[in-house]
């Protein structure tokens, strides 16, 4: 099996990241279905409703993605980052005000931009861990985007 050239990997990685977060390219999402396109139409009240009564709120889903991006950046720079409290967000993010909801979305945007910059300036994709981390950002975010979009179907029905 031949290896892929890093520029091909990078081109596809950035296209998938862009589609997942911002602009549809036709890889896997329908029009107007990226994460930020989805979030722009969610109110703080909607973001505060736990779907199914015991499940996470949309605000917690978004805060978790922002937290994940922050942690991934730290891990990419140092494979031994401090221990993360992965359950903290699910336990603490519930009802949000419009200002808090906007702040969570801004945090997500900031962390996403930091990940983009990190990936763009990475000197070489020389390890499977680095490639795995990059792919995990797309996959993990796509999973939560699906959770958010499914929750919206329930909340708005």
Task: Tell me the role of every PLM-derived stretch.
Residues 3-39, 45-89, 125-157:
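Short, contiguous alpha-helical
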């Amino acid at each position: 099996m031949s290896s892929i050239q890093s520029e091909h990997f990078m081109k596809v990685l950035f296209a998938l990241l862009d589609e997942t977060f911002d602009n549809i390219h036709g890889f896997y999402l329908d029009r107007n279905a990226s994460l930020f396109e989805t979030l722009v139409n969610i109110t703080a009240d909607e973001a505060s409703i736990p779907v199914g009564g015991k499940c996470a709120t949309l605000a917690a889903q978004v805060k978790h993605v922002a937290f994940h991006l922050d942690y991934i950046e730290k891990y990419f720079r140092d494979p031994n980052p401090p221990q993360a409290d992965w359950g903290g967000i699910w336990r603490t993010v519930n009802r949000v005000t419009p200002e808090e909801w906007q702040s969570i979305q801004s945090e997500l945007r900031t962390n996403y931009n930091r990940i983009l910059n990190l990936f763009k300036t990475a000197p070489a994709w020389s390890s499977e861990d680095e490639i795995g981390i990059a792919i995990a950002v797309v996959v993990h975010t796509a999973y939560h985007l699906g959770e958010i979009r499914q929750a919206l179907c329930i909340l708005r029905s």
